[in-house]
Amino acid sequence: MKPAVLALALCGLVSSTGISAAQEVKPLKVMLITGGCCHDYKKQTEILKKGLEERINVTVDQIHVDDGSTKPALPIYGNPDYGAGYDLIIHDECAADVKDEATVKGVLKPHVEDGIPAVALHCAMHSYRVGDINKPAKEGSADALWFEFIGIQSSRHGAQKPIEISFKNHVVTKGMKDWTTINEELYNNVKVFKTADELAKGKQEGEKDAVVVWTNTFGKNKVKVFGTTLGHNNATVEDPRYLDLVAKGALWATDKLDTAGKPKPGYGRVKK
């Protein structure tokens, strides 16, 4: 086994049949949404696309706008059927001031109504803030629209400092070891919804410990959502441990991760 494949195997991203079976399995079609305030999304969209396509059997289509505002002009707005034909949507946008309830419902429609699973990364948790973000939102209320879907409500972060990550036992985290990030943002937890399952906590000097990795199952379609608040800086996003985590979260959300934490046949790394 080649060294690169061996490294992925140690993280559970290559199964014994994954490479050969992947030749016969159609790649998962993934939409990656990036753009908005405060992050190097132009670079991060490329890091994520490359990292995911190297690790698992996916094709990543990028929906990116080079708009650094808190109201990025993403083409998904006003187009509630934007997810048609996709197996997974990754929300990595930062849109804190997109607050119109109808717009937020349109963003949620492919998930809540059509049942398309999701991955939510970093500032996605600080997007689509309808109502008072500092008060725990009541389930079913307009204030909870986005937060209830992703599973966690967050309102702020502190200064950038290293975060000590401690994982819990879960199929997504099998084979992963605790690690400490470079300087990063620890997002607070205003509320962790009952449907969310905590996978890792983060500890940072001067801040209260917070859930930083989780899964959520939401709504009438029991749509699966994998989330992490980690990933502000490019160096974190391109860290192989981070990319492994997001890749396994994507497989979990699409029901392509087995009980041993490995890709189901055909969904592991595709041999190039």
Enumerate the predicted regions with their spans.
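Sec/Tat signal peptide C-region and signal peptidase I cleavage site
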Residues: 17-22
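A glycine-rich, often tryptophan-bearing local segment used as a flexible ligand/cofactor-contacting loop or short
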Residues: 96-175
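Proline-centered loop/turn at the N-terminus of a beta-strand
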Residues: 117-119, 197, 224
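Catalytic beta-strand/loop cores that center a nucleophilic Ser/Cys/Thr
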Residues: 53, 59, 152-222
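Helical hinge/lid and interdomain linker segments adjacent to catalytic or ligand-binding clefts
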Residues: 23, 29-33, 40-127
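Extracellular ligand-binding/catalytic regions of CAZymes and related secreted enzymes
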Residues: 23-28, 43, 54, 84, ...
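Active-site rim elements
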Residues: 35-38, 157-162, 231-240
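Bacterial N-terminal signal peptides
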Residues: 5-16
